[in-house]
């Protein structure tokens, strides 16, 4: 290393970081070859030197080379721990720029620029000494380097830096260095750093590199690093005119610095600069549009920051970042005080570097190129501590899908997120204020953003429009249409077919299911299945070995076997009563031992032995009825009650007929109980047919309705005849033109008072007026109560 160069060496754990993942890096002796497509983060150079030779800047105050292509901050890169004799306390952050210069104490560069595709070389100043090569692709910003003393070869070198801006028209990379007020000594062998006293403030360096176009960086050890840009995209127009681009940067100013802003114009130039350095391929060089660099410094005062109440800031904008294709004159006016720039075109610029420079929020921001940007920083406030690698924060999904945000810079230099109104341009500090303000634009809220080009469909959601367009595509393809199995209607996608089938299902809720073997009909498919098993199925796999009777379930066979064995496992705790059925035991206890159970329920008058049982029983009455009938508004507290309701109300046919009285029943068990009631009673035989009945009144009615042809009672209007006077009275009500009994809960109406009463009790009455004398269970009809007694209380009173 000669005395004209300053050697900066970093040793990292054998890695060269390529942010895009599309580049390739390899070592060839002392040569580093880097292939870049869009963006490269230079970090962790392995056993190599980064050198700038013979670079002589003329004006150290402000020389800027701005990237004309890149406006995207890609990703965060944090320097790892430097494995050397000492740790560096200066902070280096590499999101989009490269820090490649050290300045003596007497000279403070505000901006330093190296033009496009030109190796920063020919540095003759003795104060900046770098060994061999430094890649300065696209641009270098050296800002806010104050009170920094660099010792090269163990000696302090103080000299003036003369900047000589090079003219070129390709800027391939951008480097921003934001140093702080700290004092460091860099040795040639390592990088030992001595931190100044406590009077120095904490600071952070931000190092950012980004590329838009693919390129190759080659280092041959002698001629310096070169940048071969292979992209052939020409941003200029065919007539040779190039648009002008405005970029705005904000950096921290030194205490007491008065110059807080300015502009630098960078014009087009030839492929060869004035120092005679030729580009790698002049024929393939990109013509770069004119661009204007607007920079602004902000004083960093901790005292002002403590006194500032950010919540009090409403709509006043000190510096606003404009994202999108707005007029460039508005952008320049927001960045530079009252400076007007005409006929400029603003490119999209995401101000993530500003937010990183003035805040701790390192959340990723997504730009329109689809790449994510985040910022890792190394804090040097810990003195000589190692460069700790911070974990990046998890990316937060934006809270709002419909509201855009903008970042403004407050008087303290911190970024503030505001919510601009897209109609009038007013800015608000919260989304709630913006929503409240949007009520002043009702005509805009009524408009929908997205409209289908094939029909009049409009929506505010992009995904809804996408699904709608897909339906058009599927409709045009008749061979891919989906057909409904029930009605044959075609649909474009499965979602529409599913919705259509739900309509069939709702209609099928009132459909009656008929038995194909008999006239049985019910509204429930489950009841029809049970009917088929009970009546028409001959499969009884569980056979009793004693009597040969078959059962469908093993539990039924187990209960039946107790008849043959005489087993009575259920024993009364108050007497010697035993039963083979648990329900019979409960009935026995409640009826025979009511004195031992003094606690009664106030609602159903059931008795219990202690208060806990009464309280537990009371929950049954308080329980909400959650079992809803699918065919009407009836609700039951349990499934068994609901099933009884469906059988009694919504099952029309009575397939199980009594042979003696021709009475029909829903279930075979009901018919069996009914036949048992005929036993022991005198049967009355019809003399005209085989009809038998125990009730003589029913027999007489049978004879009148079936075997009597005389109809003495005739209607005067329609001449219809009736056998009884009561039948004629009922018939005459039909000619009145009105329905006498109209249900107030539904549309049911009838002229029969008894039929109307049965309807109200069975459908709309939640009370059970007919109660069992043994267990106090309620029923709507007397027939239901009698069936209950025959089933559950047949052994009552037996020892």
Swiss-Prot record:
GO terms for biological process: fertilization; germ cell development; homeostasis of number of cells; multicellular organism growth; oocyte development; ovarian follicle development; parental behavior; post-embryonic development. Keywords: Activator, DNA-binding, Metal-binding, Nucleus, Phosphoprotein, Repeat, Transcription, Transcription regulation, Zinc, Zinc-finger. PROSITE patterns: ZINC_FINGER_C2H2_1, ZINC_FINGER_C2H2_2. Gene3D superfamilies: Classic Zinc Finger. GO terms for molecular function: DNA binding; DNA-binding transcription activator activity, RNA polymerase II-specific; zinc ion binding. SUPFAM superfamilies: beta-beta-alpha zinc fingers. It holds the Pfam family Zfx_Zfy_act. Belongs to the krueppel C2H2-type zinc-finger protein family. ZFX/ZFY subfamily. PANTHER family: CHROMATIN-LINKED ADAPTOR FOR MSL PROTEINS, ISOFORM B, ZINC FINGER PROTEIN. Probable transcriptional activator. This is Zinc finger X-chromosomal protein. It comes from Mus musculus.
